[in-house]
Regions:
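Nucleotide and nucleotide-moiety/phosphate-recognizing core
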Residues: 1-135, 139-149, 154-171, 177, ...
Length: 189
């Protein structure tokens, strides 16, 4: 069984408003991510500080962040605490161009380590597969004041998938309004 946890707890500071709800061709950004996850995953969860604002999404389960702080590792911690599977897919809610094929690819390539995409030299820590076994290390990292996802995955160790075929366009995070304009120009949506 493939469980997917979409992390939607960011602050959207650079975007100026909640980017997960920003409309892209008549759909909120997060809905594009959810629909691709639903193509290939058995269960899809949205993890957020205020999950009720995603109640319009069909076929997903909403989870409230366990930790009060608003940062990506809080969502990851919630997902690791919730799952009863050995591993899970983690996606960021601000990547509307992701494709189900990429989710399937990283799932098939993952074993018992964190597995992430590396595209054009950049690691994407919020598009990958995480084993449940990293939860205790994450707890220690958080207790020590750690906040950065990349710092955490470097501490634990990870594997990468680099061959994304024709899907390199999918690795755009929507952090600014300019990013949204770029995404809207790509004829994939």
């Amino acid at each position: 069984m493939i469980e997917c946890y979409i992390l939607a707890g960011g602050q959207s500071r650079r975007f100026g408003e909640d980017k997960t709800l920003f409309p892209l061709k008549r759909k909120p950004c997060i809905q594009w991510v959810v629909e691709q996850a639903q193509r290939v995953c058995d269960r899809v969860f949205v993890v957020a500080k205020e999950p009720q604002k995603y109640s319009f999404l069909k076929g997903v389960e909403l989870l409230k962040d366990i930790l009060q702080e608003q940062f990506a590792l809080a969502g990851l911690y919630t997902a690791l605490s919730h799952t009863d599977q050995d591993r899970m897919v983690i996606l960021s809610a601000d990547m509307p161009l992701i494709k189900g094929e990429l989710i399937s690819l990283i799932w098939e390539r993952s074993k018992n380590k964190i597995t992430l995409f590396k595209v054009k030299g950049k690691i994407f820590p919020l598009f990958g597969v995480y084993p449940k076994g990293v939860k205790s290390t994450l707890e220690e990292y958080l207790k020590g004041g750690g906040l950065r996802v990349m710092e955490f995955v470097e501490k634990v160790g990870y594997e990468v998938v680099e061959d994304v075929g024709p899907f390199s366009y999918a690795f755009i995070n929507m952090n600014t309004k300019e990013d949204a304009r770029v995404i809207l120009k790509i004829e994939i949506l």
